[in-house]
Amino acid sequence: MDAPSIFTRKKVAYACATLCCLLWGSSYPAIKSGYELFQIATDDVPSKIVFAGYRFLFAGALLLLFALAQRKPIARLNSRQCGQLAILGVTQTSIQYIFFYVGLAFTTGVKGSIMNATGTFFSVLLAHFIYQNDRLSYNKAVGCILGFAGVMLVNVNHSLSDFSFVWQGDGFVVLAAFILSAATLYGKRISQTVDPTVMTGWQLAFGGLVLVGGGYLTGGTLAVHSAAAALVLAYLTLLSSIAFALWSVLLKHNRVSMIAPFNFVVPVAGTVLSAIFLGENILELKYAVALALVHRDLVGK
């Protein structure tokens, strides 16, 4: 009988989940810097999709090379598993990001951040109906509400006074969050028969390739104008490979409702790190309260 994985230990799982979300949070300022360095206009969605596609394509390739270095059989997949990985790549990476980027083009960053946080609710609710050992409880519901409140508080400003709902903007971001949640649960099932690193590598590479092709076909372009631009893309590639692979391992060995709420850390971490690296203002009481709410959500799971 195999020994329990180290990732089943709560302290290890929590530390790794926090690391993943801090890495994803750091992508906020990195992506903003990337748009400037690659000279991508704010409304140039196709070029943004190309940029994201290369990020995931390279991240997937990096993970597959890492799996090869560990002597894991990256090509020993049957036709059913290949189909599953293709579906996972198209949904979790391609379709999800297309809806996300198109949605952001028709809504504000504030509303987009809040709407995207609904993904945690979807993950917990879907897990409730799929897994018998992952039912929704009072504490989980309260924790999700507190975490969502923290995300909303980070985004409190005058723009919230007119919080209308636009389907092509806000609706697309919510739809992207739902697709990501559903695809993540699908990935959890695949990881029971395919190594998580191999699974993540193939889905990122395939999904990224679809994004690159789709971005170019719709008029997107991408040119490296400086070494700094290449370094930013390299960092985004590295953080994606580490965070997505580690997240897949965590979901394989733990309940979804135990890991998913850490996603509330991402927008808060993104705000804090943007303030540090992009010089944005963070010396406001709302940020401290938001961090406290998110922390209360995580320790109360």
What are these regions (language model features)?
Residues 1-50, 90, 162-189, 209, ...:
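Glycine-/small-residue-enriched transmembrane alpha-helix faces in small-molecule transporters
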Residues 50-52, 57, 61, 91-92, ...:
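Specific alpha-helical transmembrane segments that line the substrate/conduction pathway
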Residues 37-92, 122-126, 179-183, 200-218, ...:
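Transmembrane alpha-helices of multi-pass small-molecule transport proteins
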Residues 34, 51, 103, 129-136, ...:
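Hydrophobic/aromatic residues within transmembrane alpha-helices
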Residues 9-14, 44-47, 77-83, 156-179, ...:
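Juxtamembrane helix-entry segments on the extracytoplasmic side of multipass membrane proteins
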Residues 63, 125-126, 138-157, 264, ...:
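Hydrophobic transmembrane alpha-helices of multi-pass small-molecule transport proteins
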